[in-house]
């Protein structure tokens, strides 16, 4: 299975390193539309959503990602990637990809200094607690009818799935746990 990490900004290397630990996965750093269109799954990493959103448009990557979504290729957005996938962003008129029926609040847990780690119980992902790293993290304020809530932290939605789309407010790539990767890769079957 050919799994790409959008290679324009953010935690690209960390996602690539995790994918390389999983048997049968060809990890690809996807920096152009031609590479994107060859993928069986795509991860949109954390970083700075405004900068990544601009790059998506300026380099024609947005259209390629929209084509992947039309083909129901699994797409997973972590932190900024989740913001890019959202149909609605609170207090922000921009809509980057707009492919997932969620409304997100950017930097909902505060600034960089307010970043934190916690442990979450997410039965759909693992029977064990999962470490979750939140860095200037967003959260999901509301979801549409077809969206499955996977995890909450202090009453706020921090992970969700809609068909082939997965979104996490936190960074599984910054932990030693591969549970979210295995769950995401099963969306392709």
From Swiss-Prot:
GO terms for cellular component: cytosol; glutaminase complex. Pathway: Cofactor biosynthesis; pyridoxal 5'-phosphate biosynthesis. Pfam families: SNO (PF01174). The keyword RNA-binding does not apply. Keywords: Glutamine amidotransferase, Hydrolase, Lyase, Pyridoxal phosphate. InterPro entries: Class_I_gatase-like, PdxT/SNO, PdxT/SNO_CS. Transmembrane segments: none annotated. Catalyzes the hydrolysis of glutamine to glutamate and ammonia as part of the biosynthesis of pyridoxal 5'-phosphate. The resulting ammonia molecule is channeled to the active site of PdxS. This is Pyridoxal 5'-phosphate synthase subunit PdxT. It comes from Caldanaerobacter subterraneus subsp. tengcongensis (strain DSM 15242 / JCM 11007 / NBRC 100824 / MB4). The gene is pdxT.
């Amino acid at each position: 299975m050919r799994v790409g990490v959008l290679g324009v900004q953010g935690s690209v290397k960390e996602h690539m390193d995790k994918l390389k630990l999983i048997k049968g996965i060809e990890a690809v750093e996807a920096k152009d539309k031609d590479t994107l269109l060859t993928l069986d799954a795509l991860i949109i990493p954390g970083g700075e959503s405004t900068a990544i959103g601009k790059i998506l448009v300026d380099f024609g990557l947005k259209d390629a990602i929209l084509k992947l979504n039309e083909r129901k290729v699994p797409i997973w957005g972590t932190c900024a990637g989740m913001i890019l996938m959202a149909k609605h962003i609170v207090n922000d008129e921009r809509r980057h990809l707009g492919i997932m029926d969620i409304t997100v609040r950017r930097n909902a847990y505060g600034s960089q200094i307010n970043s934190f780690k916690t442990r979450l119980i997410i039965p759909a992902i693992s029977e064990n607690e999962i470490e979750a790293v939140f860095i200037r993290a967003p959260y999901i304020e509301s979801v549409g009818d077809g969206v499955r809530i996977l995890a909450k932290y202090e009453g706020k939605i921090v992970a969700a799935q809609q068909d082939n789309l997965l979104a996490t407010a936190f960074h599984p790539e910054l932990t030693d746990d591969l549970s979210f990767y295995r769950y995401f890769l099963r969306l392709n079957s």
